[in-house]
Amino acid sequence: MSLDKGTKEEITKKFQLHEKDTGSADVQIAILTEHITELKQHLKRSPKDQNSRLALLKLVGQRRKLLEYLNSTDTERYKNLITRLNLRK
């Protein structure tokens, strides 16, 4: 369950801070959020898929750590990203 190249490029263009930005926390969080959304949909169709469930938990933890990092370094970007991605908090 991975995102295709086109989807990643689209997300990167939408959330990048400058033209060549591909790895900022904003971009990573946006890509993880899309991946989490896809995994949630997969688990609705296949509720017994335990490997995907564990992968989902791992991705959510990774996103949480990145969000905590972004909040501690640049609170304004954090709040902006939360609203753009429609995440709770």
UniProtKB/Swiss-Prot annotation:
TM spans (from-to): none
Cellular component annotations (GO), alphabetically ordered: cytosolic small ribosomal subunit
Record SUPFAM superfamilies: S15/NS1 RNA-binding domain
Keyword presence, Ribonucleoprotein: yes
SMART domains recorded: Ribosomal_S15 (SM01387)
Top-rank lineage group of the source organism: Bacteria
Classification via PROSITE patterns: RIBOSOMAL_S15
CDD domains, per database record: Ribosomal_S15p_S13e
Cited Gene3D superfamilies: 6.10.250.3130, S15/NS1, RNA-binding (1.10.287.10)
UniProt xrefs under Pfam families: Ribosomal_S15
An example Gene Ontology biological process: translation
One term of GO molecular function: rRNA binding
Keyword tags: Ribonucleoprotein, Ribosomal protein, RNA-binding, rRNA-binding
Function summary: One of the primary rRNA binding proteins, it binds directly to 16S rRNA where it helps nucleate assembly of the platform of the 30S subunit by binding and bridging several RNA helices of the 16S rRNA. Forms an intersubunit bridge (bridge B4) with the 23S rRNA of the 50S subunit in the ribosome.
Family stated for the protein in its record: Belongs to the universal ribosomal protein uS15 family.
Subunit organization: Part of the 30S ribosomal subunit. Forms a bridge to the 50S subunit in the 70S ribosome, contacting the 23S rRNA.
PANTHER family: RIBOSOMAL PROTEIN S15, BACTERIAL AND ORGANELLAR, SMALL RIBOSOMAL SUBUNIT PROTEIN US15M
HAMAP family per UniProt: Ribosomal_uS15_B
Protein name: Small ribosomal subunit protein uS15
Provenance organism: Chlamydia felis (strain Fe/C-56) (Chlamydophila felis)
Gene transcribed to yield this protein: rpsO
